[in-house]
Amino acid sequence: MEEFLNNFKSYSRADQRWLSAVFEAVQQQFSPLLDSDGFSVARLAQSVVEKVQRAVGSDCADLPVSYRIVSVSELIRDQRTACCSSLCWSSAHYRDQAKKAEQTLPNYKALPRDNLLLIGFLCDGRADGKSEGEWRVRDAGGSVPCMMLKSSCLWLGRLMLFPTWNYIPQNAPGAAGYLELVDPPVCVTLEAMTFDPGGALTEVMSVRHAAELLAHSCEDQVCVCVGGQVCVVGPLLLIRGKRFFCLVLSDGGSSVALIIRELKHQYWRQCVCVGQSVWISSLRVCSLGALEGRRVLTDSCQSRLHPHTPLQESSEEQDTEDDTHTPADTTHTLADATRTPADDTRLASDPAVRVKPSTIISFKGTVTKILNAEAGLYELDGQVGLCLAYQPTQKWGGGLRPGAEIQLHNVHFTYQASAFAPRAVLWACLRSSVQITAFSRLCSELQVTEPHGALQRLLLERNLGPSQYLWLCYCQKAIAERLSPRWVRPDRVCVVAGRLLDAVCDAEQKTKKKRNIYTEMIQEPHHCPISMYCVRWPSAALWSVQQLCVWMQREVWSSLSLPALLSASAPHMTALELNSALRWSSVELRLEEASPDPLLLLGVLELQAESATLQLRDHTHKLHCLCVCRDHSPNISTAWQGCLVCVRRCTLVMERFMKTNFPSWKHLDQPSYITLKHCRVYLQLCMDDLIIISPSSSMSHQMAESKLTHGHTHRSCGESSKRLRSADAGVCERADSSAVCVSLLFRLENKHGVTLQNVSADTHTRQLGFKCRAVCVGGVQRWSHDPKNCRIQERERDGGGQTVELHFRGSCVRWFPVLHPGCVYRLIALNTEDVGVLEAKGVSARGGVTQLSSPSLLLQPQWRVHTLPEEPADAQAAAPALMSVSEVLHSSSAPEVVSFHGIISQRITLQEDNEAQPKIKSVSPTADTQEDLRVRLTVQDAECPGLMVHVYLDLSCGLYTLGLITGAALQVHHVQRKVSRACNVYCRSLPISYVSVTGLRSVCSGPAAAAPPPPMMLLGSWASVGSQQCLVAQVKGHVVCVLSLRLQWICSLCGSIFTQTTCGRTHPPCDSTSAVFQAEAKVVLEDGTGEAHVWFSSESVCGLLMLNAVQWEGLQRLVRVKGHVKVYTRGRTMTCDDSPDDSIVQYLSCLCSSVSVCRQIHVTCRRRAQKTGKSQLRKVHRGQTEFICKFPPALQLQCQHIHTR
């Protein structure tokens, strides 16, 4: 060191310390790697100082003492954040560059600057056993990979000073980052570098002659030296443990392919670029079996690469300056590239899918965003996509960080290949080259990807096209955000995405020819998997559960029209009737109506205890599901819990609940009268339409085979199908179900509805619960593993027959929607061998008291219930038979508590009873406003739609029931059958009642068909005893006379008579200014078989009187003067009690007696409630003969519609 420092005696003490540090670094890091005979440490340190001073550009008297020399090992170990360092930048220059970079991409910050001095040897990694065709900076402490904008093969093995560089670390512990060498390195060693071309340069063969040589028969192993312009630089490939890359040299119209496969030459790929002229010596001629014996050139151990440069530039500086390049191919702009050929084709399997050819272009741009590093997707210039998936994965992203400028050659341009990617996407194939022309000055996180990621494996295994791959990446990102890691492990995300792709694409659409990579790299004209692409296919969007809920609520509330919710009689309703009619409404939308493109919904089915429903959920939200089967069977298996499913067809239902105080229908356009509104959004699903992406662990082999047979289960290939089959197989063979347990086999007899039950006598706490009655098929059994839903063993059938009561409380209420009478279940208690935990306990009888109840068993939250796919022969019993609506109406032996099935034809929300408080407030998390919600369902017979029964439900007594909308098939359990004073049968709910929807016409049967018209009835038949429960029918007859006609204006608030502009109520006075017009007429209708009294309400009176709109409005104005007019039949004329001589009364009397009113009429009527009366005796004259006949009471009907034709 003294010898070295003697050359710098005039320097300051600070300079001396810095020089000492340089000497120690040279002695420790670089001297051990050099030949001891070549250089002394002092001479090498002297050369380092000179190169540093020259790089700084300052006076030789100044040294960069602020820069600390750093070794490679220190850089890797200590530098945990990205940084940059430059010897030639001033502070002002750095700030200007940083500001300019941040203005280009405002979301990123510039790389922080560190004053570090980096020196090392450039090598290709062979010394470290890491020869992967990359440059590395090496010293005695280790090596780190690096990237350069331009490099020369003459730099290999030389000691270099790196003036300007960026270091990008990895976040993984123990992993090294990489260097970005911004400026060319400066050679420190000055030894002469001799160039061995490996052959005489005077024998350089042109590309045209080389192509002719390969075309004609020649001996293999012939060595030639070829010079030409590089037109293709292929990626470095690893095939069967061997690395190689492809170069294509061109000259004029001729080209020749070179395969570089020697380990020591693989760094050449970093030294050449498209457009550069090179010579390569000692190339051998060989044949490729993959190309049917086609001859190509390959390198040998003696081959050398030499760039073509003028001779006068051969000097020391030539080694570190940029190589001379000839102009590259014309670089296309985005506007030029979008002018793609207009011709396209169609897929044979789907004529709606267009297939277009891609265009090969060159492009230059700036990386603005990393869309998906694992998928190799980037964004250029804010609008163009770049995909590198069809090339081998580059380490560290190939330096493609936001802000980097790149040059692309021989890339494929596609336009609108996918709806989930930029419109214009550039694709790099095995013939494309990606060259960085300027490193990014911005700080961005390094996203490290595996060399062979799951997405790339799927791409290669299934030979996907560009459009399919973009859709696969879209699914992979969506699944990772919404389902991982709770339901889908991170390493299985791509597998799930692949299954989704299989579900969307048909087998014919996915199958392509086997790839030949040598043909893709070498053969002309070029053809590869990217040469043809589908336009925007697959186009199915994968929505999250929250996205669907938000869209549904926004769509329904924004399109809310209050007049559309009301019937035609809305102008005649009082405020109480109007507001009651607005309390509830529902909207049904199909999933395909949410978007012009197909929609998919992906989620996990889980049982929810708070609402006792099946839910579809992901990380964003959860959505209640009303699940039915196509055969209207209610038997939803417990194995669906935990299944990852894809929903392609379903109906979105939103039930709206509003509290309003509109004075009249004229105020419906004023939303201020709406005091409260909220909604319930849920899905109507048909289980047969679900695609099982990942089955639950308890899904049995028999169920999976049944689904596969009917084509409803997703079939996947390769590893996906193997996992599906293994997951669907019987769980008895699974090795991970090793917990000891006990089980009990039972068949469910019946179950009660979910209600709030007292937990203990000491507190007033109540919780949800329900009770079931079951018959034990066998005794309690011990297991060494969890049997789940495997086949029933013989030992489980011993000792059965006991009837027990099963009590479900708290979180156990979640089993309610999957427990069905008549089905067999296995109850399992894990982690115990005590059979007593599943034995039902009874109450001991004392004092001669007879015990009527069965032994009971309270289920624990950790216990599991599994539906068994088959029933044992000794326990088979049909589910309790349900009555039909006809049997409920007509059966004389019907019990007081009945269960029946039918179809909802009407739902009416009953008027709110302000005096009565709700018995039990709803505990559903979204149903806090469903207090005092009582509805009347009109349920019609499935076989005879004319037979109907009213069911009154108090929905505030338990959990809210989903799906009670018109057209739904349902089963009503445990309701009380009652007979009114008018001898009409109706039903009302009990605390143990429950309603289960078993069929949804809009889901299982496609678009809902128009309801069949009511049957045509004769009045005599309708009045008979056998048809008394036909509620709605069509009748044709003659209007004999009008019995009464009442026209009135009443106050919409209190119902009193309204005269002109004031309400007639005086005690207490009413100051309302809103009035509604009401009309009612009662006529005698006769059809030859009988007669009926038909009532016409406000909206149908006008049609009965045959008045047009102007006449009807004028009549209303005249009536408003008096407020009330009523005429009725007395003898053969019509009169009025108040003023029979009034002009209005005389007009109405004349009108009601006219032939325009007493005419043939065709009406649809609903039967009114009427008491059973005695027959009346009347005198009937036939000529001179008088008869006394017995006439039954007239049939009372309410007109619903007057048919004009």
Swiss-Prot record:
Major localization class: nucleus
Family annotation (InterPro entries): CTC1, CTC1-like
Matching Pfam families: CTC1
Subcellular location: Nucleus; Chromosome, Telomere
Keyword annotations from UniProtKB, A to Z: Chromosome, DNA-binding, Nucleus, Telomere
Example of a GO MF term: telomeric DNA binding
GO biological process: positive regulation of DNA replication; telomere maintenance via telomere lengthening
Stretches for region Disordered: 303-349
Gene Ontology CC terms: CST complex
Biased composition annotated in UniProt, kind: Low complexity: 327-340
Description of how the protein assembles with itself and partners: Component of the CST complex.
UniProt family annotation: Belongs to the CTC1 family.
Function text: Component of the CST complex proposed to act as a specialized replication factor promoting DNA replication under conditions of replication stress or natural replication barriers such as the telomere duplex. The CST complex binds single-stranded DNA with high affinity in a sequence-independent manner, while isolated subunits bind DNA with low affinity by themselves. Initially the CST complex has been proposed to protect telomeres from DNA degradation. However, the CST complex has been shown to be involved in several aspects of telomere replication.
Protein name: CST complex subunit CTC1
Organism field: Danio rerio (Zebrafish)
Gene designation per UniProt: ctc1
